[in-house]
């Protein structure tokens, strides 16, 4: 279970993400240039804020209702304070995200018994796993204009979690040793 210490809470949490390729998936945001991912993130966060009642209450839906495309009449208990509000995330999220999540959840349910359940809430939105702005780097992992700068990990836009950030950081450290 999810807990800040003993991991013995009645609650559990996990993050399921979909890939968004800022160059291919966001043509509507092209006029923002390198900040298009940041603008898209702002729009997603605004959508969640509005759907939650313009407060810190998070919009949510039972997992089965999300996959089936129907509004949840009630939600499961949550450890998130200040709470959840039932919202049609299946139709609120851009189809780029919603359709990918729905098909992914359905596939998980086929492969892991008990995964596709009404006992789970889908809570929106966790709007990023890495930086919405990618700091450029060359084939040697160094910034193309600033010698000695090796953008890496989540902050540089090259990783989406602890393991991938560690792996990218290791690659950048090795590149720095060779390059410096």
What are these regions (language model features)?
Residues 5, 24-26, 76, 147-148, ...:
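Glycine- and aromatic-enriched mobile tails/lids
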Residues 67, 71, 105-116, 173-180:
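Structural signal for hydrophobic packing residues in well-ordered secondary-structure cores
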Residues 68-72, 127-130, 138-140, 163, ...:
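Short capping/connector residues at structural and topological boundaries
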Residues 84-159:
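A glycine-rich dinucleotide-binding beta-alpha-beta segment and adjacent secondary-structure elements
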């Amino acid at each position: 279970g999810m807990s800040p210490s003993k991991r013995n809470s009645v609650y559990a949490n996990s993050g399921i993400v979909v890939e968004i390729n800022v160059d291919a998936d966001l043509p509507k945001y092209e006029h923002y240039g390198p900040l298009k991912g940041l603008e898209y993130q702002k729009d997603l966060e605004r959508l969640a804020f509005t759907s939650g009642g313009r407060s810190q209450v998070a919009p949510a839906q039972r997992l089965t209702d999300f996959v089936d495309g129907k509004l949840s009449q009630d939600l499961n208990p949550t450890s998130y304070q200040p709470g959840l509000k039932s919202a049609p995330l299946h139709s609120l999220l851009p189809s780029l995200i919603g359709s990918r999540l729905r098909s992914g959840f359905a596939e998980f349910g086929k492969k892991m018994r008990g995964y596709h359940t009404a006992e789970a809430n889908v809570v929106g939105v966790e709007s990023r796993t890495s930086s919405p702005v990618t700091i450029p780097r060359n084939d040697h992992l160094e910034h193309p204009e600033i010698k000695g700068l090796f953008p890496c990990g989540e902050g540089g836009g090259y990783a989406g979690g602890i393991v991938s950030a560690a792996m990218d950081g290791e690659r950048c450290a090795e590149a720095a040793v060779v390059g410096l």
